[in-house]
């Protein structure tokens, strides 16, 4: 899991992204499509067409980092807007990375009774 400070801004790039893109291609998409600066320290999250893989672009002040996660089962929950970006919290990103619906997180663990 990526350690994300609670005050960090996280942007979801809505729609579908060519997940084959690397740092340069995603940085260009942030600038041209989202109209934001990829070098300010915000996290930018992109989802592939199938929905089972995301990439996160982040500039930490020293350089760009690119993180990727693919789910073994299921798909990442994503906003239905076709273009633009949606801001979410660091906690919502943590839910997303765990494969949980970040819009309505539900605790699913139920302890079993002993005996």
Functional labels for PLM-detected ranges:
Residues 1-115:
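Polybasic/polar functional segments that serve as interface/processing modules
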């Amino acid at each position: 899991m990526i350690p994300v400070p609670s005050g960090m801004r996280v942007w979801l790039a809505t729609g579908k992204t060519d997940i084959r893109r690397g740092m340069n291609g995603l940085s260009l998409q942030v600038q041209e499509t989202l109209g934001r600066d990829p070098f300010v320290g915000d996290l930018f999250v992109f989802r592939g067409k199938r929905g089972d893989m995301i990439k996160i672009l982040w500039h930490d002040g020293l350089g760009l980092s690119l993180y990727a996660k693919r789910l073994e089962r299921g798909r990442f929950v994503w906003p239905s807007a076709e273009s633009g970006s949606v801001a979410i919290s660091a906690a919502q990103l943590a839910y997303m990375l765990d494969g949980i619906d970040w819009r309505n997180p539900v605790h699913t663990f139920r302890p079993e009774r002993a005996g």
